[in-house]
Amino acid sequence: MISAALAVLESEEQRNELSEIYENNISNFYNIAFQQLHNKHDAEDTIQEAFLAIAKNPGPFFDVAVNKRISYINVIIRNTAYKMRDKKHKVSENEIVLDDTI
């Protein structure tokens, strides 16, 4: 699921570490995203988007102490889920407004 994100990373060591974190914590990551979005596909998209964001700018993630990296990912997933939820909510509001004008 995060193969696109892993492909962006230049270091094999970073790819292995991020892949291992993903494999060991996917259930937790999914639960965080699903709690906000209540939709399986949106939760999966959120996780992929969060890992891609880390891969595109890996410096801050790999600068964090090893024991805090999962918490770091949790925050990114939660924030990404908030953004997706707000974006979908805004689209829904616009659809309602458009429907009222017809």
Where on the chain are the PLM-derived regions?
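Arg/Lys-rich amphipathic alpha helix in sigma70-family domain 2
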Residues: N74-E95
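Sigma70-family region 2
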Residues: S11, F51-V66, K87-H89
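Acidic, proline/glycine-rich intrinsically disordered inter-domain spacer in sigma factors
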Residues: D100-I102
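Alpha-helix N-cap/helix-initiation sites
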Residues: R15, S19, K40-E44, V66, ...
